[in-house]
Amino acid sequence: MQNIQNFIAGQWISGDGPGQPLMHAITGEQFATVSSKGLDFQGMFDFARDKGNKSLRKMTFQERALMLKALALYLMDRKEKYYEVSYKTGATRVDSWVDIEGGIGNLFANASLRRKLPNQPFCIDGEYAPLSKEGSFIGQHILVPKLGVALHINAFNFPVWGMLEKVAVNLLAGMPAIVKPAAITSYLTEVVFRDIIESGLLPAGALQLVTGSAHNLIDFVNEQDVVTFTGSADTGRLLKRHENIIEHAVPFNMEADSLNCCILGSDAVFGTPEFDLFIKEVKREVTTKAGQKCTAIRRIIVPENMVEDVSYHLTEALSQVMIGDTKHKNVRMGALVGKGQVEEVKGKVVQLLKDSELVYGLDELILVGDNTQNGSFMGPVLLRATNTEADSRVHDIEAFGPVSTIIGYKDIDHAIELANRGKGSLVSSIVTYDDAIATQYTLGAAPYHGRIMVLNRDCAKESTGHGSPMPLLTHGGPGRAGGGEEMGGLRGIKHYMQRCAVQGSPTTLTEITQVYQPGGKYKEPSKHPFRLHFEELTVGDTLITHKRTITETDIVNFANVSWDHFYAHTDVTSLDGTIFTE
């Protein structure tokens, strides 16, 4: 029996007691236990702050980014091992690709941001602000790494991506992290985490891991720490109200599951490419990861006169999905993460049926594979709303599995109203070839959504899909979705850094920021700057030459010396028709 361990203060440690049993989602067999009982959580935070933080904040953005790139390459070389373990979660190869290579892709994406960052441990934020008449007193914002640790409390559905999409950002920002995956799939997180540590690429204390229950982890955070949470809205709200979070004003970034929707434009009737794209997109979002995605389509909002067409074609599409052992080449949908999750989803379906009717599903499953009878399987369920008003359960209850509800709308304004009745969602999409409809919907629904995807025939081939958050775009949403925001390229690192407004003379702020500030004193180097090596140059070095008139002969001579006859224009006729004159 495998024992899933925790990584604390540089050591792999097992928790006390028998631990929580971990079951194979496909076969239903127990293969491991996990426990975090008896761990020294205070010691974890102290080690992260004393060792990890001090090391990371001394590194420049360039060094941190290159560290991420090296780690991404290291993990990519070992990805097949992760796919094999991911099978136990009930995932197909495609499901696992999103989790594993999608997660590693976040490391690559954040590493690429080094092109926009200085070779310093900190950076400026925005333009300088002139604060005086003569220019002798100015202001400039800077971003410096916080002195604490990021505590990442993650969901069960993406044990690799959920970890890497967060740690890529905090490590680039110069802040260590304690990763707390959901226990039920922590075995996959542990496998990847072991390779991260064995790579030797990260300084001591940069990352630590708690695989079992979180217990009282939040009791140990302080005002220099950051807490991120991904999971159910109920649990997130409970943690957000924690006395320690409130007392120390600890930043709490919450990304909760939401009632995401996909809209079918009134122009996308049966027979158009957009109708086919809509059916394909909804089918994929219902079945990928067996519907266990925080971004999955929960509400299918279509014109009232197309409800029957959509119901028929979605039923046909879902009925063709083969379910079972994901090692079988024909299987397109695997198991839910555990039997408890199956029961919870079925319970939510019962509640949803009070405001809807069954279109497809809940039949006895025909599973592919010999050893699947004890697995955590559930087939796709398609409902049709009978009550679409604000008090309808379809706008309030989320079944976190392969379940979605069709809702009819009267016009685009009604579609916007229905979408916004989700009270805040991570993502919405609209499938239409009418840009006027797309514009009206986007502007009307944006206040209630963190991301909106517009899909049509022009972009479908390269579209990343409704359910895929991208590293360089923000991920999060208002209201029910948690009110948080993560990733988003350079926006993401700011959550782990302190913005400080610095005021003073331009010369002093030039030295502090290592960026020349308008009005700062010039420095005269001991010799011509062209004779200095790069490392000998300092910000503010200036060469003041005698005034002279540049002649055509000078330009011709320069072109001949540099062999630049393209940018150094020497032909007067090339100025014809331009705003320039001789």
Predicted ranges, named:
Residues 1-135, 320, 337, 346:
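N-terminal Rossmann-like NAD(P)+-binding subdomain of aldehyde/semialdehyde dehydrogenases
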Residues 28, 64, 174, 207, ...:
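Residue-level signal for inorganic ion chemistry
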Residues 30-37, 52-57, 131, 151-152, ...:
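Short, well-ordered beta-strand elements within core beta-sheets of diverse protein domains
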Residues 80, 105, 109-119, 129, ...:
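Non-catalytic terminal extensions of PLP-dependent enzymes
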Residues 102, 367-381, 412-505:
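C-terminal core of ALDH-fold dehydrogenases
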Residues 118-277, 409, 462, 484:
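Rossmann-like NAD(P) dinucleotide-binding subdomain of oxidoreductase/dehydrogenase enzymes
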Residues 195, 199-200, 224-226, 234-390, ...:
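ALDH superfamily catalytic-core signature
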Residues 525-582:
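Hot-dog-fold acyl-thioester-processing enzymes
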